[in-house]
């Protein structure tokens, strides 16, 4: 195949020939690896004799996808483009429509993506924790409080079992220290982000972070039921379309939090935002979010 417009269904050998026509090294083993990681759907089984079968056929759309991924990899300045940098595009395509990416392929792509997210370096995890802290930390929060919350966040993400009885009070001390007004009366000065009519508190933001961590773990284990994935996609697809229509207006009303609603620059950043945002909806639909927020609420009551 030299032109995607001329594409027809093909075997793994056909895909290898396509790759070599582009000057890219390829083998049937590489094609199988792409299938395993969700970059390609499984080929369609063809039984042609009583005792055997012909090589499976990759759908026309998958053959075109294979070529486009190879072309994108060739344009990359990196000497090697790992799978986890490609799978967000596969997942984003699946979230948008049903025409190219199969549900089975999407599950494997989500597993690959989750494995990459779960294998983040300590430096990356620390940067994420500090970004969350910086969003909410009250100007009067001490460095000691910041360090304490950072340590608790990192320990909680690593263990998947946050110490809510310790973390929630520490979060409150960070985001809402006790202050005194002009009359000398003590009051709790809570710091939030987002829109005035629907502010996001620090404990809620950390709860969402933990939900995403739990979703990542479950996707890595492939333990989220396929039905939940499809239901979450259906709901997310509607909500994401509405958000895209509203985000400019939300940014205009966001004040200091306007950056939360600003669309990222570059298609790669947009794809990653799209995929990362799916985790929250999936966590709720799959029943993973409520137990986590129950723990957060219990921690708040114990304060």
Language-model features, listed with the residues they occupy:
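Polyanion-binding surface elements
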Residues: 1-40, 113-114
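Short acidic/His/Gly/Ser-rich catalytic and metal-binding motifs that mark active-site loops
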Residues: 42-44
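Arg/Lys-rich, alpha-helical DNA-contact motif
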Residues: 2, 46-303
């Amino acid at each position: 195949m030299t032109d995607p417009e001329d594409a027809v269904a093909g075997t793994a050998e056909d895909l290898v020939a396509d790759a070599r026509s582009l000057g890219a090294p390829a083998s049937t083993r590489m094609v199988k690896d792409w299938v395993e990681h969700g970059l390609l759907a499984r080929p369609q089984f063809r039984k042609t004799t009583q005792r055997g079968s012909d090589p499976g056929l990759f759908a026309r759309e998958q053959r075109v996808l294979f070529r486009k991924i190879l072309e994108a990899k060739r344009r990359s300045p990196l000497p090697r483009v790992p799978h986890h940098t490609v799978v967000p595009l596969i997942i984003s395509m699946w979230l948008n429509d049903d025409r190219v990416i199969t549900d089975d392929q999407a599950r494997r792509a989500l597993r690959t993506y989750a494995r990459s997210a779960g294998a983040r370096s300590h430096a990356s995890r620390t940067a994420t924790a500090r970004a969350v802290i910086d969003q909410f930390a009250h100007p009067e929060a001490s460095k000691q409080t910041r360090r304490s919350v950072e340590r608790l966040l990192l320990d909680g993400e690593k263990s998947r079992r946050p110490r809510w009885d310790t973390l929630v009070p520490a979060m409150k001390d960070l985001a809402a220290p006790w202050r005194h007004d002009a009359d000398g009366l003590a009051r709790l000065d809570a710091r939030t982000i987002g829109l005035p009519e629907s502010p996001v508190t620090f404990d809620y933001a950390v709860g969402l972070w933990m939900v995403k961590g739990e979703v990542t773990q479950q996707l890595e284990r492939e333990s989220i039921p396929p039905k939940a994935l499809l239901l979450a996609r259906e709901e997310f697809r509607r909500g994401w379309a509405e958000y895209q229509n509203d985000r400019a207006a939300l940014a205009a009303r966001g004040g200091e939090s306007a950056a939360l609603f600003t669309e990222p620059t570059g298609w790669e950043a947009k794809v990653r935002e799209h995929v990362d945002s799916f985790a929250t909806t999936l966590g709720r639909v799959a029943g993973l979010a409520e137990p986590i927020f129950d723990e957060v609420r219990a921690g708040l009551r114990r304060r």
